[in-house]
Amino acid sequence: MRGIAQCQDYLNMKQDNLYQQIHSMKNLFFAFKKARKGKTKKYYVKRFEKCLIKQLLTLSIELKSQKYSQEPLRTFILRDPKTRKISKSTFRDRVVHHAIVRIMDPIFDKNFIYDSCANRKGKGNLFALKRFDLFKRKITNNLNSKAFCLKADIKHYFQEVNHKILLTAIERKIKDEKVMWLIKQILGGGRTRQRYAFRQSYIPVFRKYLS
């Protein structure tokens, strides 16, 4: 907690462009708070927080100098109930993910349709349920007639996303070359032998920008 309090000294930094906003101490601090939400007792969060200013300063310097690269992923098997191979990024890298999203979200969010609910502020499960109930009643004449609802899932979506199409969609809105460099670093993974795993882990960060 002491590290968090000390970080308040950096919160008044003013930045001019998108990339500077991403690697600012202010943004990285709030990204850290977002990344640790619900995980404050995890050992890796406590370890990061123990030297918080040093960790965030290091990230800021690496990002500013464009020397940042992702750390190796932790891979494990999840059964819920189907078996899936999950590749999980380190907490340090998750802070960077949240730092990017905090700056990019306001740019893209206004272009999404009203009923797009995934990973949007103020539009969680409850909002989706209320909208579903509204449409259900509308299409069934207040439950007086039959209707159909399609539930679908795209198999291996994250692994199969075309990077060229995704980057083109992002570039329509993001003109900062350094931001695009960072996004390409994340999507590329930085380590060829882990490319498939990195795709699984990092594409979800940008998936909604395809909407």
PLM feature spans:
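Active-site-proximal segment of RNA-dependent polymerases
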Residues: 1-8, 12-18, 103-159
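Conserved polymerase palm-domain catalytic core
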Residues: 55, 62, 135, 139-211
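Conserved pre-motif C helix in the palm subdomain of viral-like polymerases
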Residues: 84-113, 193-211
